[in-house]
Amino acid sequence: MSLTLITGPATEPVTLADAKLHLRVDGTVEDALIQTLISAARLTLEAHGNLAMINQTWALRLDRWPGSVVSLPIGPVSAVQAIFVDGIALANEAYVLVPGGEARIARADNAPWRAPSGLAGGIEIRFDAGFGPEGTDVPRHLHHAILMLV
């Protein structure tokens, strides 16, 4: 299994102005450092929580299907863009995003998944994860956690 970031977040969940207010910093001398700290704090929380704060696109590669239901390792998942087996896209109607806390996909018809012909990485699942496109979409407790780490 490998997980690759295809499209990263367009913005950070915490603005430079919010971080500077929290830190009680005036002026612009430390702006680049503070912006770096905001990104580092977000990345740390995302890695520890297996989540995406701002909308991102990911590709999950598998050697074989783990079962009839596939858990996606990052959430919250808003959409599955496509599923490829040996480079060929499955029809969107062939699978569903299972609702619930953990992001999972399953075959819509409960049929078995088509097996890849190769030995490694023959399955690719592209999906969108994140609370939304803006920092205001991120839950307040995560916003506050970023400020505390900064």
Question: Model features per residue range: what roles?
Answer:
Residues M1-L149:
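Divalent metal-cofactor coordination and adjacent catalytic microenvironments
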